[in-house]
Amino acid sequence: MAEYLSNAVQNVALDNPVLFTDSIPCNKGYIYHEDGTGIFILKGCTNNCFARYQVTFNGNIAIPTGGAITPISIAISVLGEPRLTSRAIFTPTVVDEYGNVTSTALITVPKGCCFSIAVRYVDATTDDPTTVPTPTIEVQNANLVIDRVA
């Protein structure tokens, strides 16, 4: 198990990753991450056909001052593509109103391969193309836990 944290408020632009500054890293080398970045590498080191990881993000998100009031969301992305089933949506009523969101995904990495993952600010309004997402959100108390489950 590995845990990655970032307690300070950070502005995250649309389609960009949340950055993680502190870590309790994996001691077996299954997960690679440099503090201060938002990209993680999961390794398919296994005697089986695949390695499986459970990735869970928890954090507080808000629209910064000056932003438009729209639904906001984060999602876990794999190889640069958001897993929309992991999308966590919050709809604030005013700017600077934080909401706690949690997102989880099971990620299967084939033997001998490596997958990159990140937690990204994604468009929460994909169902309504007339709504324009706010360009940035604030993220605070970001916490990412990665467990190797198989």
Can you say where each PLM-predicted feature lies in the sequence?
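Extracellular jelly-roll beta-sandwich "head" domains, especially the C-terminal globular C1q domain
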Residues: 1-150
